[in-house]
């Protein structure tokens, strides 16, 4: 909850686009539902096409299968041939996102895999947007091309579930049956 509503000025609003890693898992499916409740557009990243219907049923606008791309893991040394290959795939992934956002970069990236996805998250979030992270399920050694961070004024924000007020707000959504835990 805090990841999407607790880090001003990057607070989820109607019409915003949010990329959600692991959209069929516990954290991801919760984030998809929060986006739907807020009127935002969740683009869920999945690892298997069999998970698409579930993610869409939770309220995602679209899904993208990460296995169709090869831009995962720690970022290769900048300007190396491996880096250039990585960036070609990251651009391809960004274009796949644009197919669902009318050519716009995402406002927020809901990040929890960490090591395998952070470089791509920082690349695809919009200028002035936020990558918000609450875990490192694929590892804790985060790499990125810092030029995309400072030249495009992006924010990387650490987070966790919620403070007492935010927990109460999240619980209220469940009591109102607007979220399915």
What are the residue ranges of the model-derived segments?
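Glycine-rich phosphate-binding loop and adjacent beta-alpha segment
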Residues: 38, 46, 55-56, 74-78, ...
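Short internal alpha-helix immediately C-terminal to a glycine-rich phosphate-binding loop
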Residues: 1-38, 96
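Alpha-helix termination/capping residues and helix-transition junctions
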Residues: 9-12, 57, 103, 176
């Amino acid at each position: 909850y805090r990841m999407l509503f607790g880090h001003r000025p990057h607070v989820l609003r109607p019409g915003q686009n949010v990329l959600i890693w692991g959209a069929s898992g516990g954290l991801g499916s919760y984030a998809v539902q929060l986006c739907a409740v807020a009127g935002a557009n969740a683009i869920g990243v999945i690892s298997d096409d069999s998970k698409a219907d579930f993610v869409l049923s939770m309220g995602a606008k679209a899904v993208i299968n990460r296995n169709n791309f090869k831009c995962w893991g720690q970022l290769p040394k900048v300007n190396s041939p491996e880096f250039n290959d990585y960036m070609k795939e990251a651009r391809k992934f960004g274009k796949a996102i644009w197919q669902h956002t009318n050519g716009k970069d995402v406002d927020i990236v809901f990040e929890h895999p960490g090591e395998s996805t952070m470089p791509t998250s920082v690349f695809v979030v919009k200028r002035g947007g936020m990558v918000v992270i609450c875990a490192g399920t694929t590892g804790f050694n985060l790499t990125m091309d810092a030029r995309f961070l400072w030249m495009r004024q992006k924010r990387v924000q650490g987070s966790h579930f919620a403070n007492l007020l935010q927990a109460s707000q999240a619980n209220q959504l469940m009591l109102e049956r607007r979220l399915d835990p």
